[in-house]
């Protein structure tokens, strides 16, 4: 069995689709932890809808995605923990396909399908919809089944990922000192690699990712650019150099 950690903030419609696909798409009954990062009332209707199939961790004040992920992980009851975002859609049989791809001392990334070109060469680019409200989940499941391959390679290091509960803790989880949710994932995957974990990717399970939800004003975009740069600066302060990304296998290094 797997414990799933889904942090959520202000996207109840996306969360609804995410949970529907996770619950209806699973082969076994897994633990699904929804970490509500503030704004419980905004998400209350969706949480009530799936209350018999999820565990809710309600953080009354917004603490940010990094802290929310760590708290969700600490509350996992199974030895394998799957970290996923609320703007993902789960494929059919995601749980048994992930478990069959997992090996001890590894981190298994599920491949993704995205509607627009990506920096990650392994992703499948197919526009199956940009609107969560009108998304055809059955059409996605049929498409995903047609392109899924029983293949695993060492090109992991992206979300969503499956990891042993203790392995996550051994590398210190996600560093909560980062000034935002950028770069911290690069550091996490780098720490996993440095600790001897194999960074795998399975093509047996392909999750849909909406990429960017919500309206972003030019001011917000500029603000995020500054925060992202601050995250790079924090990494350099901590490690003595800026992070490097290998575009061929997604490996993160100094």
Locate the predicted segments by residue.
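Short, acidic, metal-binding catalytic loop of nucleotide-sugar glycosyltransferases
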Residues: 21-29
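A short, conserved alpha-helix in the catalytic core of glycosyltransferases
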Residues: 156, 160-161, 167, 171, ...
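A conserved acidic beta->alpha catalytic loop
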Residues: 36-45, 89
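Active-site donor/metal-binding and catalytic loop motifs
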Residues: 179, 201-220
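Glycine-rich, basic loop-to-helix element that forms the pyrophosphate-binding segment
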Residues: 59-76
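Conserved donor NDP-sugar-binding/catalytic core segment of glycosyltransferases
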Residues: 93-130
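A recurrent flexible, glycine/aromatic-enriched loop bordering the glycosyltransferase active site
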Residues: 142-163
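Short beta-strand-to-loop acidic/aromatic patch adjacent to the donor-nucleotide binding site
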Residues: 78-89
């Amino acid at each position: 069995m797997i414990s799933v950690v889904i942090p959520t903030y202000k996207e109840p419609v996306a969360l609804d689709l995410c949970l529907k696909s996770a619950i209806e798409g699973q082969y076994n009954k897994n633990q699904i932890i929804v970490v509500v990062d503030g704004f419980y009332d905004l998400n209350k209707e969706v949480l009530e809808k799936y209350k018999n199939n999820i565990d809710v961790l309600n953080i009354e004040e917004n603490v940010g995605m990094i802290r929310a992920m760590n708290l969700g992980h600490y509350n996992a009851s199974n030895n394998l923990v799957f970290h996923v975002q609320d703007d993902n859609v789960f494929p059919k049989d995601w749980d048994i396909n992930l478990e069959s791809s997992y090996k001890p001392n590894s981190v298994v990334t599920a491949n993704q399908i995205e509607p627009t070109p990506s920096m990650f060469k392994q992703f499948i680019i197919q526009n199956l919809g940009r609107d969560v409200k009108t998304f055809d989940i059955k059409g996605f499941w049929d498409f995903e089944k047609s392109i899924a391959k029983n293949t695993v390679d060492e090109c992991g290091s992206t979300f969503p990922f499956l990891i042993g509960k203790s392995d996550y803790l051994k590398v210190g989880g996600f560093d909560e000192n980062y000034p935002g949710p950028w770069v911290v994932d690069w550091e996490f995957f780098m720490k996993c690699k440095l600790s001897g974990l194999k960074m795998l990717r399975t093509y047996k399970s392909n999750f849909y990712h909406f990429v960017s939800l919500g309206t972003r004003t030019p001011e917000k975009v500029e603000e995020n650019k500054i925060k992202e740069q601050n995250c790079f600066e924090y990494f350099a302060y901590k490690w003595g150099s800026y992070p490097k990304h290998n575009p061929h296998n997604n490996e993160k290094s100094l």
